Amino acid sequence: MQQPSSVIIVGAGLVGSLWAVFLARRGYQVKVYERRPDMRAAGYRGGRSINLAMSERGWKAVEMAGIREQLSKTALPMPGRMMHAVTGDLTFQPYGKEGEAIYSVSRGGLNLALLEIADRFPNVEFFFEHRCVDVDLDLPYITFENMQTGDTHQVEAPLIFGTDGAFSAVRYALQKTDRFQYTQFYLDHGYKELTIPPAADGGYRMDPKALHIWPRGNFMLIALPNADRSFTCTLFLPFEGEVSFEHLKSDADVTAFFRRFFPDTLDLMPTLLEDFKNNPTSSLITVKCRPWQWQNRILLLGDAAHAIVPFYGQGMNAGFEDCTILDGLHDQFGGDWSKIIPHFAAQRVADGDAIAELAQRNFIEMRDLVADPKFLLRKKIAAHLHAQHPDFLPVYSMVTFSNTPYHIALKEDDAQNRLFAQILNLPGIEENWMENPEVERIIRGER
């Protein structure tokens, strides 16, 4: 069977632009269509997206694409969380072992860099302000509207990759097919992006070697460092309720809210009121669907296939891992897309569902449990067990610092939750958890 030499990518976001690099390196003629204007010319504005945390899966993908060195220059290591109590007390919680860290990267900056890298390949062509209006499911064609002129044109498309996000036009076409399963779920919480600018002397106003979290039970504030010495902050808060966005209408409301719940931030955020007014309040969606492919010639990747909430820092990493796995299958099946695509779609969907569930669970951990003494004790015991039993890997480390399939990490999370339910119920465990024979017995029994 003759394999296509040209491919269409719908969506020039993070996953689409990275996948264009992978395909270009293999010699394909790649056409990338994007609904939005070229962000390199239009300029990138924040306010809609959350700073990203690059971890092992993401780094592996950019390494395989040959672009790690270019992208690592502005990535800032965060070896742990810095917890901010209402009293102003700070507690540092390492993410993993010595030397392990996640990396703060700007979504816009990363997307700009990937576009630049992809555009250097002579066999990659970008078409901006082109909206996908129809995907022919019977014949290899796709139709785009030029949003500047209003003209539509049909493009031959023997191979289509839908990387056009949570509200994917390519997926929408597949949703019309028989037995296509699709669910979407919105959190009751929204988010708003805020800023801590550099200090007057040009330095950071807080420790840049941490992801800062202000956990407040049903809501939280987080802050990630940027290379320009600022922090990108994100407030996660219910849309409605006693403490919610609906009650933050005036400058006085916002100031009183921050003074009550995040008092140590007021001096750090001179543009708080301006940011709060000007930046949108955005929603948080989870998307699950199956199958991710159609007739071995149309494939969904990234958020188009598996949009998740951001609380495990894995949305981008999962999308980049899609590229890694697909590229490996290209080698395994000798470039035969009739085998690559169905194999990928069948193998990967369980991982998409699993990281969606893990991200939901981590939301509860970040906003609430991180301030709970029992949870902090669990973290200490888990780190100790990992040191004593190297095969015991905390689930966070499994997800963040390894390439363990997400569905395996989810099973391990269930197992470790059962294990720690027993350990934390042991009498006097708070004072006697190191070298405790009962803990060892439970570990041996559970494992």
Place the predicted regions along the sequence by residue.
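C-terminal helical "tail/cap" subdomain of flavin- and related membrane-associated enzymes
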Residues: 4, 328-447
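Generic enzyme active-site microenvironment
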Residues: 32-33, 162, 301
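Conserved Rossmann-like nucleotide-cofactor binding loop
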Residues: 15, 38, 167
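Glycine-rich FAD pyrophosphate-binding loop
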Residues: 24-47
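Conserved mid-domain beta->alpha element of the FAD-binding
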Residues: 9-25, 194, 280-371, 390, ...
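Active-site-adjacent segment of FAD-dependent monooxygenases/related oxidoreductases
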Residues: 45-117
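Conserved FAD-binding catalytic core of PHBH/FMO-like flavoproteins
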Residues: 116, 121, 130-134, 139-284, ...
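Extreme N-terminal leader/targeting segments of oxidoreductases
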Residues: 1-7, 25-26
